[in-house]
Amino acid sequence: MTLNSSPIKRLDNKPPIWLMRQAGRYLPEYMAVRKEVKNFLEFCYDVDKATEVTLQPIKRFGFDAAIIFSDILVLPHALGWEVDFKENIGPLLKQFKSKEDFKYLQDNSNDKLEKVYEIVKKVRKELPKSTSLIGFAGSPWTVMTYMLEGKGKQDFRVSKKFIYENKDLAKELLNFITEKTIHHLINQIKSGANIIKIFDSWAGILPEEEFKKFVIEPTKKIIKSIKGYFPDIPIITFPKGAGLLYEKFLEEVPTDIIAIDPLIPLEKMKLWSNKVTVQGNLDPVILLTNKKIIKEKIHKILSIMENKNFIFNLGHGILPETPPENVEFLVKCIREYEYK
């Protein structure tokens, strides 16, 4: 089963499987490599180590796609913006506050992003041909929120106040990030990625008018630009937390695949699969429970999504405390499931 076609095809009635953050802290082999590197960003730019951890979940679980080990904040970092990752705290960034701050952003990225593209090339070379390779970037809006807030996981009042009060400057920053995101994704495709994903982790914090301006419009621009060069590359979008605005997103954004968060009803996911391929949406916390619950939840999703354009995934990233044996059980449940 592969994720190589557009739209993604099913084989033997079984959906393809991969998991967000499948290369990560829940794997002991990942932690062994992580301990060898001083900081997280250095890890993201280390060609050999990033390649190794990208391949780890493929070797262990046989997922149908690998996703490059990287981070959405390598883009602003490579463009000269101050970004750091603190243990047990997360990302810390210089705050973008005024037009003057554009002087800290370079028009051309330094050689840091070249390391990312080397990782893509090396992974593609070592990955089984039948396994797809997903390149990715953060959405312009989500990357912008980190730059405006100076850190992650806030209530986003700083970002929202900024875009309400500084419409022209907010648009200028959004456009800058959008253009750089397009180049970053295209370069990943040129390096060997055959699927692209746009992570919009904070799409769900915006009201409808701002959602259109800061989520829908830049995503449309990115997709149009990529398709101009690579019309057959499938693009996955993920407007996490968008709720009812998922439908507006689907109406306006020409996405090939849409990732669904756990709060969207399965019947909606089933309905949307008539228009696009849907991906999701198991709650990651389910993998912290027991096999009985895991099997029950997986079977419910599979029964509803039978014969639909569907990729099995979580509704968000796998949690660090997830037992690897539960992930192994998830894969087993999906591959052994018998449709009625």
Swiss-Prot record:
Chain positions of site Transition state stabilizer: D71
Keywords: Cytoplasm, Decarboxylase, Lyase, Porphyrin biosynthesis
Pfam families (alphabetical): URO-D (PF01208)
Keyword flag Lyase: yes
Disulphide bridges, residue numbers: none
GO molecular function annotations of the record: uroporphyrinogen decarboxylase activity
Binding-site residues for substrate, renumbered to this chain: R21, Q22, A23, G24, R25, D71, Y146, S201, H316
Pathway, per record: Porphyrin-containing compound metabolism; protoporphyrin-IX biosynthesis; coproporphyrinogen-III from 5-aminolevulinate: step 4/4
Oligomeric form and interacting partners: Homodimer.
Function, in words: Catalyzes the decarboxylation of four acetate groups of uroporphyrinogen-III to yield coproporphyrinogen-III.
PANTHER family in UniProt: METHYLTETRAHYDROFOLATE:HOMOCYSTEINE METHYLTRANSFERASE RELATED (PTHR21091), UROPORPHYRINOGEN DECARBOXYLASE (PTHR21091:SF169)
Protein name: Uroporphyrinogen decarboxylase
Protein species of origin: Rickettsia bellii (strain OSU 85-389)
